[in-house]
């Protein structure tokens, strides 16, 4: 009996460690990916208010950062499933220096930038925050005015 219990517990530990945060720790309706949990919020907020909203969940939460095409595809499917309205969605990328130097709010590396054709353009010298675009299936990005009201995608470590 003792040996069976030990083997069972060991298998459970291995199973949970293989799954990591991808299934065990995210709240309901959040997407587990890469050790983080992601949620799209239907509240319309400007970029700064959206970032502050994400940070209020717990320390270390931010607007989402994306680092691969696989991330973009996964988030595209998730946003399409959970976004109740139409519209572009804020992510955590912006150009704070206004010199085409794009930075993530979580300070992760900027290694993936699937811009829409002719973007970014800083149109009218007003567009410094980044949204994922609905008419591209949320697979491409556009810079927009940080004051525009959008749904947004948060990422948290749980």
Curated annotation (Swiss-Prot):
Signal peptide: 1-23
Residues holding Ca(2+): 119, 121, 127, 142-143
Tissue expression pattern: Expressed by the venom gland.
Short motif Galactose-binding, span: 119-121
A GO term for molecular function: metal ion binding
Main location: secreted
S-S bonds: 26-37, 54-154, 129-146
InterPro entries for this protein: C-type_lectin-like, C-type_lectin-like/link_sf, C-type_lectin/snaclec_domain, C-type_lectin_CS, CTDL_fold
Pfam families cross-referenced by the UniProt entry: Lectin_C (PF00059)
Compartmental location: Secreted
Glycosylation site positions: 134
The keyword Ribosomal protein is assigned to this record: no
Summary of subunit composition and partner proteins: Homodimer; disulfide-linked.
Family: Belongs to the true venom lectin family.
Function description: Galactose-binding lectin that binds to and agglutinates erythrocytes in a calcium-dependent manner.
Official protein name in the record: C-type lectin galactose-binding isoform
Natural source organism: Pseudechis porphyriacus (Red-bellied black snake)
Taxonomic lineage of the native organism: Eukaryota, Metazoa, Chordata, Craniata, Vertebrata
